[in-house]
Amino acid sequence: MRTLVILPTYNEILNIETMLRTLREVIPSVDVLVVDDASPDGTEKRAQALSEELGQIHVLSRPVKSGLGGAYRAGFTWGLEHDFELFVEIDCDFSHDPRALPSMLVAAITHEVVIGSRYIRGGVIPRWSLSRKLLSRGGNQYANVMLGLRVADSTSGYRVYSKSALEKIHYQSVTADGYGFQIEMTHRARRGGATIIEVPISFTDRAHGESKMSRAIVLEALWLVTKWAVERPLQLRNP
């Protein structure tokens, strides 16, 4: 199946070249779409140069920084317009190991949504403090209980979606960003009847650049989970 790796970027000049070369080495056949939010550090220009050298690399430029969710929505739309069938979400900072992608694509043969999970057997998070692990797992468990997601890692940003999954999710109307975006996509996939599987991954904090996550994004996710949980019984009574 034609596969598109969607790579949102903002100020990733220290990572973009290594990431694109690694993706090309690991899975030479995939196309990569760099969705850049007007990075002032030259990320877009470097991606354009690498697209000419490596091939099958495309650059979608957005005029302003508009968030992770917006970048993925734009990437999904671009990919569907260009007849791709599988869509990969991955961070550019190597917190998601590109070498785990082949096993995720194998799982995508039989499932519509594949989540790279830190919290199933085999998943690891090296160098995280105990308090950070407890906070992350607690947030995931809260979303799971409140929304009935039946996944261990609903905030993971390392994923594969099929075209059919995106159609069931109606991704164009997803409004959340950051962690909330991943939870909302999972929630809609489950409600839409998409088949979901988790595969273990190793999650490593970025070595270069600054994290794009903020306190506001975390609080947004907690608020949205609570809001969706309140709405869920009404939706069940009024399908």
Q: Which residue ranges define each predicted feature?
A:
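Short, well-formed alpha-helical segments that are part of the catalytic scaffolds
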Residues: 12-26
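Hydrophobic helical membrane-anchoring modules
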Residues: 1, 146-149, 171-239
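Acidic helix N-cap motif at the loop->helix transition within catalytic regions
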Residues: 17-18, 41-50
